[in-house]
Regions:
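Short hydrophobic beta-strand element within catalytic cores of glycosyltransferases
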Residues: 308-311, 318-322
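Short N-terminal targeting/anchoring amphipathic segment
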Residues: 78-96, 111
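Conserved catalytic-core segment of nucleotide-activated headgroup transferases in glycan assembly
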Residues: 27, 170, 174-177, 181, ...
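Acidic donor-binding loop of glycosyltransferase active sites
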Residues: 83, 173, 290-304, 315-317
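N-terminal subdomain of nucleotide-sugar transferases
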Residues: 1-54
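Short acidic alpha-helix that forms the nucleotide-activated donor recognition element
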Residues: 75-81, 167-170, 283-292, 314
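Short acidic/histidine- and often glycine-rich active-site loop of Leloir-type glycosyltransferases
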Residues: 121, 323-337
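Membrane-proximal helix-turn-helix segments that form the acceptor-binding/catalytic region
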Residues: 135-175
Length: 337
């Protein structure tokens, strides 16, 4: 590469970015913009079909190139492109394409964007399933939320998913981590070298200048992509347990639930008589968040950090969540406000 040539970056996405559908999509766009700010030349590829709310990357000057799984055409594509950096979006993309990149572009820097530790999220999901199988009627999940790092490691380390994800991190030169809690878990429990991990949280370009006053707001709000398992579990928990308790205290309360790709099973929960409103996709998440009095995020499992809670902060909207929801969202051991 000549001294004047622009750095070429290939991003291999698990899906095409949809910043208005998920926090992960928004974070990817933030990363892409940071690359563009460096004057780098970007190519975005994905084996996924384009979603309904896909961002137009070409409008930003990013080349879009669909690719296929298990197809030698990728070998020719990456060899001709000759990227200086390859960013894999989630470890599954590294598994599929990393060895091909190593073979045809051995000098390329390989970077993994984890979004969140999937092995942590899945281990927590399995623990929740185990608790629910016991048939308890209690809604106190404090023991589930109060897992020490050593306990988290015990649950994670025995899974094939953890072995695959950790292996992908080792194969890459650097991994972008959105959560400091997950960095500590990898370093202290899995004994990964800290030099392999780089903290890359959600990035904000501009802060709002003011908030709508409480008197101009109405209703409670919950928001999240219905395809994301932690969000769907939160919807069911709200419907069956949390919301009835709120309505006992506030009979006139109304809850508006927004999310991309509303499935029939979610639409079937719509019940205005109970104040439970399935509102489908919000074109402008900050607009609906700014109009709400409270943001509910009763997440019983998950990982990473939560874009919906950051949006609530930006809008001056109080949020109510669980320790899983607030994880890595506050510093210096401060309690969630």
């Amino acid at each position: 590469m000549s001294p004047t040539a622009a750095t070429k970056v290939l991003i291999i996405g698990y899906v095409w970015p949809e910043p208005r559908s998920s926090a992960a999509g928004g974070h990817m766009m933030q990363i892409l913009q940071s690359f563009l700010d460096q004057g780098w030349e970007l190519t975005f590829s994905s084996p996924a079909n384009e979603g309904e709310h896909k961002e137009d990357l070409t409008a930003l000057g990013i080349r879009e190139c669909p690719i296929e799984l298990n197809n030698a055409s990728f070998d020719r594509f990456v060899a001709e492109l000759a990227p200086d950096i390859v960013l894999f979006d989630q470890f599954m993309m590294e598994e599929q394409f990393g060895w091909r990149v190593e073979q045809h572009c051995p000098n390329a820097l390989r970077v993994l964007e984890t979004s969140d530790l999937q092995c942590l999220r899945h281990a927590r999901h399995q623990r929740l399933k185990d608790v629910l199988k016991e048939g308890t009627e209690e809604d106190d999940f404090s023991p589930l939320f109060a897992q020490a790092p050593e306990q988290e490691f015990q649950h994670m380390s025995v899974t094939d998913l953890a072995k695959r994800e950790i292996a992908a991190i080792y194969r890459c030169d650097l991994s972008l981590m959105i959560s400091e809690v997950e960095i500590e878990l990898l370093v202290q429990q899995f004994h990964l070298p800290p030099a392999l991990l780089h903290w890359c949280p959600l990035m904000l370009e501009q802060l709002p200048q003011g908030f709508a006053p409480f008197e101009q707001r109405a209703h409670l709000l919950s928001i999240g992509n219905f395809r994301h398992a932690p969000n769907w579990d939160a919807v069911l928990w709200m419907k069956n347990r949390v919301w009835p308790l709120i309505r006992q205290q506030l009979p006139g309360a109304q809850l508006h639930l927004y999310g991309a790709y509303t499935p029939p099973k979610a639409a079937a929960l719509h019940n205005p008589a109970q104040g439970f409103h399935i509102m489908n996709w919000a074109e402008d998440a900050l607009q609906v968040m700014s109009a709400a009095r409270i943001c509910l995020a009763p997440l019983r499992f998950g990982a990473g950090i939560k874009g919906k809670l950051l949006d609530a902060m930006l809008c001056g909207t109080p949020s109510v969540t669980t320790p899983v929801g607030s994880e890595s969202m506050s510093q210096d051991g401060l309690p969630w406000p």
